[in-house]
Amino acid sequence: MTPADLSAALFAIVTTAMDRRRATGADIAGLELTVEDVPLERPKNRGHGDWSSNVAMRLAKKAGANPRELAAEIAEAAAGIDGVASAEVAGPGFINFRLEAAAAGQLARTILEAGAAYGTGDLYDGLLVNLEFVSANPTGPIHLGGARWAAVGDSLARILQAEGADVTREYYFNDHGSQIDRFARSLLAAHRGEATPEDGYGGGYIGEIAAKVAAGYDGDLAALSRDDQQEVFRSAGTALMFQEIKDRLHSFGVDFDVYFHEDSLHASGAVERAIRRLDELGHIFEEDGAVWLRTTAFGDDRDRVIVRSNGEPAYISGDLGYYLDKRERGFEQNIIMLGADHHGYIGRLMAMVEAFGDIPNVNLQILIGQMVNLVRDGEPVKMSKRAGTIVTLDDLVDAVGVDAARYALVRSSTDSQLDVDLDLLAKRSNENPVYYVQYAHARTRSVAANAERAGVDRSAFKPELLTHETESALLGGLQEFPRVVAQAAELSEPHRVARSIEELAGLYHAWYAVRDGSTRVIPLGEEPVTDAHRTRLWLNDATGQVLRNGLRLVGVSAPERM
């Protein structure tokens, strides 16, 4: 029995209970129930049962009933659900459910029949989502903040897709502007053997790219004026840098569907269309020769200039055009991942969304990520050999590899600053979280291989034999996985999946470590193969499948052996 099965059965019972109360004259005509009104949770104390619900306490006031009495009514009916061993009232109105071993164990078959689809759902079935992340201008290698967004963004895309969304991964960039000018001047200075400009970019990569630009130029660079030389380095240098960024991200397992150039907003007329639309909606005014958007009407702390008095578009005009462009492309939900230094942008962007007539935090969601630090020998790593003063994605991957890097960056909430301990991630021990999970998966494959050699197969399945406390706990962890994936999608929190498979790995290791033989998949010595061994193989393989599914959602490999 899956949580969804129990939830559906409980929903039917609660609906019937409410209908009975209506029939006896209770004034609950406006009470419309959905499955979400009938929640199931894992009890913190497993001694209380397999599942718990506070549905009676949630509905008692609306139903005009005493919570414990309503809970008792629901529990009495729920005790008759196929696969439920008991339903008991606890405390002020909780209902605790215990499942029969056969019903709980049936999950192993369900998982193996579903395979890679176990954990997927239809929460966002068909929803068109634009997920914009990384979006670093091509002035240098991807820094640690961008690396975090690469791992988190790609994982979130996978999780949203698992819940049925049609996700477009998008990278927004600009190869003009002041940052690019500084980059071009830095390249030119390196080529000419001059000191790095005071506001320029340093690091070994500048010299590398400058040399490539010079080597690839079909002509005599020295014959050009300094301004023309700088334009050569700007154009060719940014192209080389951007290709390097794409290549590094690809090696990190992150690819984008769309690379959106800021200049196209003006070339396509998107900015002008956005301003015209907002004017038609009555949110534009002119003052001191400038064009303003009245964002204070939508909660912003001040109105925003969108066209300066000299006719030049202000920075926010690009945001207006870009958002409208996404909506015109059909995206119903737009997610933008920004660094902590962009926190002040949230108010104005949400006001912009509302000015267009859309819904903040629905049509546009903004995720803010905190800083990332690398730590080695207990001290922060402050310098990159290649990039100078910034520490990069390459530095992290070179130290610990792609899998450990991705897992380390995705397993913590983006709301918190992250210290990545390189020494820990290099360890082949249970202290290392990615090793812990990957080793659990590899162990499931090793057990399966050894079982085959010992003549244990899945020709029999008797889930009622899965009665050991570690088996009940492991089945509980497996049951939780689809719910965790749905929550991760709904809350845009991929770390929930990582933490879930860490917990599952722990439950599996505990099951494997039982020493009295009561959970063994492979018979000892001359012991004959029994249906208990065969059934445990189902549980072993189901665990491997879920670990594999979870690792795939966070973009980490599931090794067959370690």
UniProtKB/Swiss-Prot annotation:
Lineage: Bacteria, Bacillati, Actinomycetota, Actinomycetes, Micrococcales
BP GO terms, sorted: arginyl-tRNA aminoacylation
A Pfam family this chain is assigned to: DALR_1
Classification via SUPFAM superfamilies: Anticodon-binding domain of a subclass of class I aminoacyl-tRNA synthetases, Arginyl-tRNA synthetase (ArgRS), N-terminal 'additional' domain, Nucleotidylyl transferase
Native source organism of the sequence: Leifsonia xyli subsp. xyli (strain CTCB07)
Catalysed conversion reaction: tRNA(Arg) + L-arginine + ATP = L-arginyl-tRNA(Arg) + AMP + diphosphate
Protein name in the entry: Arginine--tRNA ligase
Keyword Cytoplasm attributed: yes
Key words, A-Z: Aminoacyl-tRNA synthetase, ATP-binding, Cytoplasm, Ligase, Nucleotide-binding, Protein biosynthesis
Top-rank taxon, per record: Bacteria
The EC number(s) this enzyme carries: 6.1.1.19
Gene name, Swiss-Prot/TrEMBL: argS
CDD domains reported for this sequence: ArgRS_core
Location(s) in or outside the cell: Cytoplasm
GO molecular function, one term: ATP binding
Class in the EC hierarchy, top level: ligase
UniProt short sequence motif 'HIGH' region, positions renumbered to this chain: 136-146
A Gene Ontology cellular-component term: cytoplasm
Quaternary data: Monomer.
NCBIfam families: argS
Family, as annotated: Belongs to the class-I aminoacyl-tRNA synthetase family.
